[in-house]
């Protein structure tokens, strides 16, 4: 083994500079952050030859005390902290005291500075770590820092620099990020005498976005915001029109510090994906303002990464804020005229009335007064070919005591529609529409009296116990788009409708899929999940990592309709699964949901998220090439109007698109 040597100060500084000063952009970042910490309002950056020959930073900040000028260039000298505990309450961008000595050890540096109370300024020159005397000079309040001939004494580092244009581009990028996080500061960047960036420091974030990215970008961004006890999440996310094939236009800031965090970026991308049909990455600018004690900024040499105490919590807050903003934007494009809204509001004070079952000798009649709906019917809405049959199959089994749930819209008027039957256990069922009354008939005989009485008892109890709560929920059910008039079906896949001169096309599969998807989530909220026992429990062997996530989310699986028991070690046994999802592969479903939880973090049961539920919902939804009659189409559209988000299927594909008369006239060149 070789002998141990103690490195001299010059060698140690050059090695340290390798971590902090990677390239000219690193120097610009450190010096501009120092200017921001000095309370500057105007910062000018000048570079030549990509920053390798000259970097000049001019600010109007507080300046440096004469006695501190030399100390500022000593290793670990800083005005930001005094003790190690101060790191966990830091509110400045710099704090280590490494940048200036690192830069001074590999470049020729000249510093001029003046405080407001001083009569003159002071100047010092450092070349390769060697100091000159501090002398008086004429200079305005603030600091001027010149860095020339970067890496002049470390040629091995200099040869690894990229081309001048590439290094200039990296400097441009870092100033862009810093300007976005400081809209109250005016930034000017000059490259070889040419102005590249100029922000005005008026505090208007959209003005900064317009200056940096252009008018087309600022016109296609949406604001989002969410707050909690420890953090505030806010920023802008781009619409689908400005999505790109790379993540270059994505910025994340924590307490005004530009960072890189893949997980938080995925939170925005997942929310964006719910409303996008393109395989591109969204434009976004994300700000996280959080109490310093909940993060650790001292985990990376360049401070470009931050560690959160609870990153899953931050992930969910970001996802929720972005998702809500995008959802509201979609809803605004399908607005209902004001006069229609007023008419709807006058008719939404529904009285909740008990559902009564009339038992006759040879038939069971379920009478629904469509002006008096129970909330359970609203929660259980379905649509299918045959839509009513799907509901019946799901809720009405001969070996269970589950009440029948059917929901037919008020405005359906048809004489006599027979539904095809491919289930021998439910013979001769049909729907009879008589004015505003809808009767569901079946050939169950008096042998079913026990079932009928059980249904009546269950519904009576539920009606009495939930009248108050459900009436409040019903009032919240409002249509998200107008009551369009059905005019036909195209290619057995798309439903055509019109309203006020606008043509609507609805993807029947995507629409029904979304209705089923929201029904499952609503069932979880209502505690109304129907489960099916497995004849043979499915045993799944999990890794230690997967098992820990399962343990953490046991309640999530339970409330979503899964009965799971430990099977020794890290193995589990699936005994019961949600009946709603029909025929499925329990193991695959469980692992899909578990993967979602690993990506999104644990949370409310309604966050047993999109992939697993949406994929399974697809399998029993109305398909393309399914012929629907007018009653079925009207029912499907009416149900779609009242769900929380009728405009996108769980995969993010649109369920409904619209064409105004102007759009169509342009296609036929009636107007230009």
Curated annotation (Swiss-Prot):
| Record field: compositional bias (Polar residues) | 443-454
**Which CDD domains does UniProt cross-reference here?**
HATPase_MutL-MLH-PMS-like (cd16926), MutL_Trans (cd00782)
Assigned GO CC terms = mismatch repair complex
* Highest taxon in the source lineage: Bacteria
| Signal sequence range | none
Q: Ranges of Basic and acidic residues compositional bias?
A: 455-465
Keywords, A to Z, come to: DNA damage, DNA repair
Pfam name, any one? MutL_C
Region annotated Disordered, chain positions: 443-469
* GO BP, sorted A to Z: mismatch repair
Give an example GO molecular function. Answer: mismatched DNA binding
Q: Does the keyword Transcription apply?
A: no
Q: Which PROSITE patterns match?
A: DNA_MISMATCH_REPAIR_1
Q: What does this protein do?
A: This protein is involved in the repair of mismatches in DNA. It is required for dam-dependent methyl-directed DNA mismatch repair. May act as a 'molecular matchmaker', a protein that promotes the formation of a stable complex between two or more DNA-binding proteins in an ATP-dependent manner without itself being part of a final effector complex.
> Which family does this protein fall into?
Belongs to the DNA mismatch repair MutL/HexB family.
Protein's name in the database: DNA mismatch repair protein MutL
Q: Write down the species.
A: Clostridium botulinum (strain Eklund 17B / Type B)
Gene transcribed to yield this protein: mutL
